[in-house]
Amino acid sequence: MNKWSDAAKYLEEYSPADDEMISPAAVAALGDAYAHLNQLDKAVDSFKKAASMADKQSEEGANLSLSATFLIKAGEILESQNKKDEALQLYQDIKKKYVNAPAAMEIDKYIERATK
């Protein structure tokens, strides 16, 4: 667990730039560190922020390679916290906004799981 704490510390100190890939990935890595440290609300916030950053820097307004993946991670954590309505909203947003994203190919199974 100490390495995850160290990772979170270093990633919290990272200054994101205005790029489409590296900065959003670093913020998502912080989300992964928080998830391993069981700081789940912080993890969800980090994944949502990473998706937003990736979209903001994308020429199309939606980063199909990263954003859907980050939002699915956030949704899975929300499900683990029994926040299925919030997870469902994320999954539905993915289905609507990231139609052509590789990660969205199986989004229906996430939607179905969150509605049970």
Role assignments for model-derived ranges:
Residues 2, 16-24, 52-67, 94-107:
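Short solvent-exposed coil/turn linkers within tandem alpha-helical repeat scaffolds
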